[in-house]
């Protein structure tokens, strides 16, 4: 049914394929690109160029002038100020705004941290026109007077999430808190969202199923088809798809049940247009709507086009008799009414009770005195029929207060998961409670090291017997887990010493243990020697060790540099580390150290390097200088010599670029190893070097070659070292929100 009409109003996360999955997916935008045509767009920060804000605009500073209590009051007043151009169901926009917030935050995917409410991407194409977001353009338009009033002091991305949170509270579901701090984008991002609506409707698509890397289970839907898999009312099949989709958002079964049951306590779904009139009555989505509609889409020519004639998902009705008040009637109806399969006016599969009593009847959303039977989706009934979900629906049904508490926690997680650690939160309503999904690190309860202490520790590291390569690679492996998409990972917390990171193949566990043991010994000796409360964390020592390695390698090449070091990192505990969640930070390839687990084809490795660099918030020159420096430093995974294009391995110099661009070398594919290239001396025919596709891309791709040439030029040797040091420090500081506010 939903392929004929506008796709359903799901209640969370159309997640995107992970960055590694994107590199492998045959449907990606880079599908037809050869390695030399690697897409560098992820490294271009066009949002800064497109921003209309002043260069010195700082959201955190602008927020300080916001009257949050007045903003909240204005939002509460708006909920019951029904507008003729889009009347509020039941006289309250609360359920509408909950859906707005949910669909905004629900795009988050745990695989690579993309999606979510941060940056306000729902305002832009393609999300603003995604079928599951039908009519949410009107919800954002309803918020415009408030945004206009408060201006730069509140971002769209904060306002959209706040709208749903205030709505919950106004309808009797007190949230556990709310954090401001989301900043706005100014253009739609170029993330691989899957297929276009046209492709979705194509008969050539494989039964509408999405590959496992996507959190949604059917194309065009935010998470699952509420009618059931492929529009078939298969309750058990629906349960499987719900679990797949919500786990891809990082939600447990308990959180999944709380969110669906709690969300469906409110509001209604819309399918008033008769099935045979849908195609003619409903206009195009916002990105294809006529210009005179001013960004509003899905124009409905049936009846009044709104109110009781509203067309959305195609399903029609409400779940409870009190759709603007929090209670556990959804669960009561789920267990106490007998549900029979039926069709909505628009022809969508849904369920209505055969034994509804007067107290179960639902008031009409717009006509006084008119009543309707409650409804359920196929996916709702799955919460009862599936054993795993049933455990929690029964538990919540019998314990209404627990249900309320678990929904509040799950809502906070849904709407804040993509914001990163708690140190990024701002505002007066931040809950005191910490959650493991926030990747907490303890606050420092000791005095930070002084400049003199740092000098002593550097000498201790030099005297430890650890090589520069050991120190550099350990620091890189620790810091390079960072993801700018959801602000997870990085050096803070020293989680490279904890499960699961300490056991990752790319971190070479046996070698890592040698380094960590020695650094812990230095840490213990130093901390025991101090009597003034000064301590150093392992996290800081790992980074300091990397700095020492870089400084020593530069010195060996004839350059004296002093790496900046900002102490303050603390060490997380194993209890503060969700092993399953952190495993999503594990990469399948890291081109900076020429690592791959073998699951990605060689021709896709240059693109995964770009994706990795993008996650580290690097630009093209920074990526380039880091790769060249890491090769010269000889810190490849497993001591591989691929790309170590230097006769002075371990010294920080520009040899990689000089030798890569040397025309006395001819490159050929190896006939012994897939993805390996052999550098042959043109005169003697003897082998000089080996390299990976990642290495050769810097001489093959025209843009990367232009940057590589700068670093290979005579007179730019010191520039190369300085630029490497700056880029290295940037990576080491990723995730240090405590000093970047």
UniProtKB/Swiss-Prot annotation:
Residues 1-23 form the signal peptide. The record marks 99 as: Transition state stabilizer. There is a cross-link at residues 102-223 (Tryptophyl-tyrosyl-methioninium (Trp-Tyr) (with M-249)). It holds the Pfam family peroxidase. GO terms for cellular component: cytosol. The keyword RNA-binding does not apply. Binds 1 heme b (iron(II)-protoporphyrin IX) group per dimer. Heme b binds at residue 264. There is a cross-link at residues 223-249 (Tryptophyl-tyrosyl-methioninium (Tyr-Met) (with W-102)). The keyword Heme applies. One of its GO terms (molecular function) is metal ion binding. Formation of the three residue Trp-Tyr-Met cross-link is important for the catalase, but not the peroxidase activity of the enzyme. It comes from the Bacteria. Disulfide bonds: none annotated. This is Catalase-peroxidase. It comes from Francisella tularensis subsp. holarctica (strain LVS). The gene is katG.
């Amino acid at each position: 049914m939903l392929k004929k009409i506008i796709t359903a109003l799901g209640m969370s996360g159309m997640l995107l394929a992970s960055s590694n999955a994107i590199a492998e997916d045959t449907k990606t935008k880079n599908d037809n690109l050869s390695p030399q045509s690697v897409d560098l767009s992820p490294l271009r920060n066009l949002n800064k160029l497109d921003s209309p804000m002043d260069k010195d605009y700082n959201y955190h500073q602008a927020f300080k002038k916001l009257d949050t209590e007045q903003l909240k009051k204005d939002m509460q007043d708006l909920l019951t100020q029904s507008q003729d151009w889009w009347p509020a169901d039941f006289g309250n926009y609360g359920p509408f705004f909950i859906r707005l917030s949910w669909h905004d935050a629900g795009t988050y995917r745990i695989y690579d941290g993309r999606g979510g409410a941060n940056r306000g991407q729902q305002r832009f194409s393609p999300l603003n026109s995604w079928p599951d977001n039908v009519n949410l353009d009107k919800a954002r338009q309803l918020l415009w007077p408030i945004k206009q009033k408060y201006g730069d002091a509140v971002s769209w991305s904060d306002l959209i999430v706040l709208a749903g949170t205030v709505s919950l509270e106004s309808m009797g579901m007190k949230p556990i808190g709310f954090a401001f701090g989301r900043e706005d984008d100014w253009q739609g991002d170029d993330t691989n969202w899957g297929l276009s609506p046209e492709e979705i409707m194509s008969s050539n698509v494989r039964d509408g199923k999405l590959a496992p890397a996507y959190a949604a289970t059917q194309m065009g839907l935010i998470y699952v088809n509420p009618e059931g898999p492929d529009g078939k009312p298969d309750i058990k099949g629906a349960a499987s798809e719900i679990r797949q989709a919500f786990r891809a958002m990082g939600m447990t079964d308990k959180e999944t049940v709380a969110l669906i049951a709690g969300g469906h306590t409110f509001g209604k779904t819309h399918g008033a247009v008769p099935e045979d009139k849908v195609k003619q009555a409903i206009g195009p989505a916002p990105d294809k709507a006529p210009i005179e509609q001013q960004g509003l889409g899905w124009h409905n020519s049936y009846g009044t086009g709104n109110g009781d004639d509203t067309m959305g998902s195609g399903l029609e009705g409400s779940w409870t008799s009190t759709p603007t008040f929090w209670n556990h009637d959804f669960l009561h109806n789920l267990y106490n009414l007998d549900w029979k399969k039926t069709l909505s006016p628009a022809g969508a599969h849904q369920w209505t009770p055969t034994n509804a009593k007067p107290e179960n009847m639902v008031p009409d959303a717009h006509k006084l005195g008119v009543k309707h039977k409650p409804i359920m989706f196929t996916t709702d009934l799955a919460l009862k029929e599936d054993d795993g979900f049933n455990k929690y629906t029964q538990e919540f049904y019998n314990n209404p207060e627990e249900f309320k508490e678990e929904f509040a926690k799950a809502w906070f997680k849904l709407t804040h998961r993509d914001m990163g650690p708690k140190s990024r939160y701002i505002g007066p309503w931040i809950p005191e409670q910490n959650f493991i999904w926030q990747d907490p690190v303890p606050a420092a309860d000791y005095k930070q090291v002084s400049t003199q202490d740092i000098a002593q520790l550097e000498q201790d590291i030099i005297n430890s017997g650890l090589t520069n390569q050991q120190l550099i690679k350990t620091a890189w492996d620790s810091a390079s887990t960072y993801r700018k998409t959801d602000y997870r990972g990085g050096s803070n917390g020293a989680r490279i010493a904890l499960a699961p990171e300490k056991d990752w193949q790319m971190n070479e566990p046996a070698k890592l243990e040698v380094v960590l043991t020695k650094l812990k010994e230095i840490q213990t000796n130093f901390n025991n020697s101090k009597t003034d409360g000064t301590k150093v964390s392992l996290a800081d020592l790992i980074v300091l060790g990397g700095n020492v390695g870089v400084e020593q390698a530069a010195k060996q090449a004839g350059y004296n540099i002093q790496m900046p070091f900002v102490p303050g990192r603390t060490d997380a505990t194993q209890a503060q580390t969700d092993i399953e969640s952190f495993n999503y930070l594990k990469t399948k390839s890291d081109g900076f150290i020429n690592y791959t687990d073998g699951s990605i084809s060689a021709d896709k490795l240059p693109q995964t390097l770009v994706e990795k660099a993008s996650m580290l918030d690097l630009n093209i020159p920074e990526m380039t200088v880091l790769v060249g420096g890491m090769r010269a430093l000889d810190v490849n995974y497993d001591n591989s010599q691929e790309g170590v294009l230097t006769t002075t391995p371990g010294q920080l110099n520009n040899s990689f670029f000089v030798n890569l661009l040397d025309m006395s070398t001819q490159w050929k594919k190896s006939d012994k190893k897939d993805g390996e290239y052999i550098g042959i001396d043109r005169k003697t025919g003897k082998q000089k070097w080996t390299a990976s596709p990642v290495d050769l891309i810097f001489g093959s791709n025209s843009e990367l070659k232009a940057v590589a040439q700068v670093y290979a030029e005579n007179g730019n040797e010191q520039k190369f070292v300085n630029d490497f040091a700056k880029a290295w420090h940037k990576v080491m500081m990723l995730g240090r929100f405590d000093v970047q506010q």
